[in-house]
């Protein structure tokens, strides 16, 4: 492929999510120029996209120069300081009318701050929630864009083309609103997921401790639930997990794992904002506290012995 071909989209951050999104865009006819500081990730990207229009770039300047105007650049980097660092390096390379999209799990107020910082530059900024994990990124995520309204017509066709489809065939991608609206919606989405996972965990505990069911029997219950109105990704993978056995001992793998759960912060943010707004979200808050207690495994073990 000629390296002078104008590319449709720049993608910064070539982890699994970024890679899979790039393949999804390519499948829908959008040529992707990718960049990552990690040379190994760039090499893997070139390997996975061999035969496609996509290619990696060795610098942000090369990536920006490869894009057709107005430039559209999607950031898939860790939320926080990494986003600010990329923006600081990108800003001098961009022109009025270019569009930046932050696809990470960014706090919505950080997105609003970045939009304000770009006011007057003509650079358009979007904060976009991306849901569906690695498989969703590859086959069809749910996308929640918000920010500069002027950017939406410039990116809507490509974003809606790669998004998952609802039962009525409408794309799972629509404009959420100004400022940090897109990331706010994703934050609440993740908070609800915290509550869902806590309810699944408590259902498992009740069946195991109160009813005496084995993990295999509980798996069968979850599989039955997944065939009805409770059917969902989380219920389905729970059934699969509970049916998995440890190859070394033959017993249920769930009985061999450490009983601690980490968290990335979106559930906490949702709970904090609910308190600020006076919105009742006790199930989400309790799910966050349950994870906090879960993470205190040494303290729990000590307390159980004294």
Short names for language-model regions:
Residues 2-72, 97, 134-137:
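NAD(P)+-binding Rossmann beta1-loop-alpha1 motif at the extreme N-terminus of oxidoreductases
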Residues 84-86, 107-220, 227-256, 293-306:
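Rossmann-fold dinucleotide-binding core
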């Amino acid at each position: 492929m000629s390296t002078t071909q104008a590319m449709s989209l720049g993608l910064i951050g070539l982890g699994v999510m970024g890679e899979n999104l790039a393949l999804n865009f390519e499948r829908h006819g959008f040529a992707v120029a990718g960049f990552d500081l990690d040379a190994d990730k760039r090499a893997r990207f070139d390997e996975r996209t061999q035969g496609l229009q996509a290619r990696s770039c060795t610098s942000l300047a090369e990536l920006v120069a490869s894009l057709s105007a107005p430039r559209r650049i999607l950031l898939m980097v860790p939320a926080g300081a990494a986003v600010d660092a990329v923006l600081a390096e990108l800003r001098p390379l961009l022109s009025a009318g270019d569009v930046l999209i932050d696809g990470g799990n960014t706090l919505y107020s950080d997105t609003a701050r970045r939009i304000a910082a770009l006011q007057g530059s003509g650079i358009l900024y979007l904060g976009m929630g991306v849901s569906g994990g690695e498989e969703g990124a590859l086959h069809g995520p749910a996308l929640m864009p918000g920010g500069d309204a002027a950017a939406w017509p410039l990116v809507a066709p490509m974003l809606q083309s790669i998004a998952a489809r609802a039962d009525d065939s409408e794309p799972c991608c629509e404009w959420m609103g100004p400022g940090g609206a897109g990331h706010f919606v994703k934050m609440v989405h993740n908070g609800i997921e915290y509550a869902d996972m806590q309810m699944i965990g408590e259902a498992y505990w009740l069946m195991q401790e109160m009813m005496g069911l084995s993990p295999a029997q509980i798996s069968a219950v979850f599989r039955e639930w997944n065939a009805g109105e409770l059917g969902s990704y989380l219920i389905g993978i729970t059934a699969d997990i509970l049916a998995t056995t440890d190859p070394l001992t033959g017993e249920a793998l769930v009985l061999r794992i450490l009983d601690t759960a980490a968290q990335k912060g979106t559930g906490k943010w949702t709970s904090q904002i609910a308190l600020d707004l006076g919105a009742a979200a006790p199930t989400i808050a309790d799910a966050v506290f349950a994870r906090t207690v879960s993470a205190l495994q040494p303290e729990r073990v000590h307390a159980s012995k004294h």
